[in-house]
Amino acid sequence: MADMEDLFGSEAESEAERKDSDSGSDSDSDQDNGASGSNASGSESDQDERGDSGQPSNKELFGDDSEEEGAPHHSGSDNHSEQSDNRSEASEERSDHEDNEPSDVDQHSGSEAHNDDDDDDDDEDDDDEGHRSDEGSHHSEAEGSEKAQSDDEKWDGEDKSDQSDDDEKLQNSDDEEREQGSDDEKLQNSADEEEKMQNTDDEDRAQLSDDDRQQLSEEEKGNSDDERPAASDNDEEKQNSDDEDRPQVSDEEKMQNSDDERPQVSDEDRRHSDDEEEQDQKSESARGSDSEDEVLRMKRKNAIPSDSEVDSDTEVPKDNNGTMDLFGGADDISSGSDGEDKPPTPGQPVDENGLPQDQQEEEPIPETRIEVEIPKVNTDLGNDLYFVKLPNFLSVEPRPFDPQYYEDEFEDEEMLDEEGRTRLKLKVENTIRWRMRRDEEGNEIKESNARIVKWSDGSMSLHLGNEVFDVYKAPLQGDHNHLFIRQGTGLQGQAVFKTKLTFRPHSTDSATHRKMTLSLADRCSKTQKIRILPMAGRDPECQRTEMIKKEEERLRASIRRESQQRRMREKQHQRGLSASYLEPDRYDEEEEGEESVSLAAIKNRYKGGIREERARIYSSDSDEGSEEDKAQRLLKAKKLNSDEEGESSGKRKAEDDDKANKKHKKYVISDEEEEEDD
């Protein structure tokens, strides 16, 4: 055995290295303390303290090296086979990388744990407890307590075998400790960069395929083929025990991820995972030159396939069970026969065969039969039955003819048939009637006023009184016309009509045809919409307008006469006798026409009937108009001019006239006063 200081170093060196590791970032110190705590748990002092504290170790929480090396293979296969579990497997790989860090540093911290004093072990245990409190937040307390007991039992036996192999591992751990110190310093500088690259790193880790991992393992095997020594029995036993625990830890992580459904990674965990990734990459590059490290690692990888293949076979069904829970399997596809195999729902009645009553075949509903006694009616309908739709000019009297109750048709009334059509008023001629009479032997027989004659050519004709109608036979389409007999509120079928008969008048000379044409003519003739009436009298409005026109003409004529007479008087006073005065008829006839009054006529009238003129002057007739007053003034004026008796007689007459006028005016005024007094 070599010198202990050469193998393990002095205590000063170990304390200096511990200070360097403590001065690192919180994430690095947590990782180193977790790694040293996981290896120190193999010692007896650690076992005693763990028994006193009752807290789970880092191995119980994170597993061993073999778990971390084997888990990527399983997670890679799961990623390749089932893409639906990418999120849960990405979280598994993240936890695997976190576990790789303490596995790479296990051997280094183990040598320091044996050489340090009990005080140092106490400090490391305190750090381990802090690290466990940080990292154990992802696991439930129930899982930690249950798994702690099972892992303690396993690792108690394994740690005893590991103690004998510590001497051999210490030599290999010296070189790794030196590289670890440099790695820690580099990790502090790259911690910030790794936080930024976290999202891309997680995706890259989740998408690693099995081929990439196999290539990496083959390259490492090629590098370590020349320097590979034979592995010790203790290492193989430790690897086997690691392989046994690996599926358990991976199952625990899967259960945790499935329970969480959406894994939530804290900032501290992300920093741990990024730092551990960096350490893995740099430790692998350092191990390329370090042959002894690679030898131990490759021996473990060579020993894994035999056991890990068995474990992978057992783990694949578990993953498949997870996907089966999410998406279902081929057995869940329902077929047409599944409904028969389904168990009956609780509370549903079940028959003797075990089938629900709803699925039983529906029994035919029995017919309801009601027994009713109806008298049987036998009718002798003859050999042939015909369906007849009577035309407008034919009618049938169903009751037998009786002269006592016979009512003739009235001209004023309208005959309507059963369908509401207006019948032609043919009176007795076109109505089919029948009656009962006795023959010569005294037997009652039926007699009718109509008969059907069948001719030799097969045609038929109906003779009704003196009228003859042609009968046409035609088949009926479909069995839709039946003969029924009314039985109370029901109908009893008797026969089915197969043929129908139609009737038409035989000739246009028959009375029936003439009445039909007349009725049609009356129906189709257009009534005169506008009637012109003769004027019985004259229009009063027209008469009124004519009277107004005549009155206007009379007024114009009177105005012309007055104007002419005024001019004549003025001329007479100035010149005396003139031609117009001496011969007035010549000018009057030309200018005034028939209505004008000549001076000669006035003279003759004055000479012939002075009294009449006076009576008219003194008359109070209201019918005399203004023209008569004017004419009277003219007469007076001319009388004065033509009077040869003198002015005395004229004055006398004027006074008489004035007196008469005054008396008349007084009478009128007295009447008005009386009316006002009333």
Swiss-Prot record:
Keyword Ribonucleoprotein included in the entry's annotation: no
Keyword Phosphoprotein in annotation: yes
Modified residues (Phosphoserine): 10, 14, 66, 161, 164, 173, 182, 190, 209, 217, 224, 232, 241, 250, 258, 266, 289, 291, 306, 308, 312, 619-620, 622, 626, 642, 670
Chief location of this protein within or outside the cell: nucleus
Chain intervals with Acidic residues compositional bias: 1-14, 115-128, 164-178, 191-204, 586-595
GO cellular component: Cdc73/Paf1 complex; nucleus
Positions where Phosphothreonine occurs in the chain: 200
Bias (Low complexity): 32-43, 328-337
Modified-residue entries (N-acetylalanine), positions: 2
Region ranges (Disordered): 1-373, 559-596, 613-678
Segments of skewed composition (Basic and acidic residues): 70-97, 105-114, 129-163, 205-230, 237-297, 559-573, 648-660
Entry's localization field: Nucleus
Pfam families: Leo1
Molecular function in Gene Ontology: RNA polymerase II C-terminal domain phosphoserine binding
Keyword terms: Acetylation, Activator, Nucleus, Phosphoprotein, Transcription, Transcription regulation, Wnt signaling pathway
Residues where Phosphotyrosine is found: 618
GO process annotations (BP): endodermal cell fate commitment; mRNA 3'-end processing; negative regulation of myeloid cell differentiation; positive regulation of transcription by RNA polymerase II; positive regulation of transcription elongation by RNA polymerase II; stem cell population maintenance; transcription elongation by RNA polymerase II; Wnt signaling pathway
Function text: Component of the PAF1 complex (PAF1C) which has multiple functions during transcription by RNA polymerase II and is implicated in regulation of development and maintenance of embryonic stem cell pluripotency. PAF1C associates with RNA polymerase II through interaction with POLR2A CTD non-phosphorylated and 'Ser-2'- and 'Ser-5'-phosphorylated forms and is involved in transcriptional elongation, acting both independently and synergistically with TCEA1 and in cooperation with the DSIF complex and HTATSF1. PAF1C is required for transcription of Hox and Wnt target genes.
Entries under PANTHER family matching the protein: LEO1 PROTEIN, RNA POLYMERASE-ASSOCIATED PROTEIN LEO1
Subunit structure: Component of the PAF1 complex, which consists of CDC73, PAF1, LEO1, CTR9, RTF1 and SKIC8. The PAF1 complex interacts with PHF5A. Interacts with TCEA1, SUPT5H and CTNNB1. Interacts with SETD5.
Family membership noted in the UniProt record: Belongs to the LEO1 family.
Record-given protein name: RNA polymerase-associated protein LEO1
Gene that produces this protein: Leo1
